[in-house]
C-alpha cells in the first residue's frame, strides 16, 4: 500500500519546478504539526526546526501520530525539495478545555496552514465526541482565530490542511472566515477527518466551501466517514 514515506523516498530531491506542490506535500505538513514542540512564533528553517524537534524525540508523549511525524521529519530534514521551507507560529496547546495545535508553513511561494488532530490525551478524545453534538466547539473557535491571525493582506495562495480532527478544524475555520479572507484560500484538504452536523452540512457556508474542499479518506476509514460531508476521494494510500 502506497504511503507518504514512499512519496518522500522518490520525490524528496525533486524540485517544485519539476513536480508541483500537491496533496502529498500538504499531507506532510498535516503530519509535521503533530511534533511535540513548544510554541514559537518566529520563522524557522527546516534545518533549525528539525534540530529542535529531534532533541525532544525520546520523551514520553501521547498519541499514535508522533512516531509517524518523527519518521517523516527524519526523511524530510535534508531533502532538497523542502530546503527553502519556513515554519512559524507553532502552537501546541493542551489544558482542561482543549487539545489544539497548528502551524504555518511557507513553501514554493505558498502559505500552508495545518491543524493538528487528536493526540492520546483524554481531553483530545472528549473533543472528538463533542463534534457529534456541538458546533462550534471551543477548539473550532480557536482554529478560526488562528486562521484569521495567520492569513496576511498580501497572501494570495493559501492552503488549509489537517489530518483527523485537524481536517475538521481546517474545514470549520475556513467555512467561518470573513469573505475577504475566505477568497484568499485556494483549497482545503481534509485528510481522514470527520464532517459536520446536519445543520452545518445544509448551510450556505458549507455549500460555498465545497468548490475549495478536498476530502481524502483511505479505504475502510472510520473517523473520516463520521457525520455529514461531501467531495470524498477514496484512496488506497495511507499516512
Labelled PLM ranges:
Residues 1-2, 6-21, 29, 34-39, ...:
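Alpha/beta hydrolase fold serine-hydrolase catalytic domain that processes acyl esters and thioesters
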Residues 161-166, 170:
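Gly/Ala-rich beta-loop-alpha elbow adjacent to hydrolase catalytic centers
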Residues 170-179:
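Short glycine-enriched nucleophile-adjacent loop
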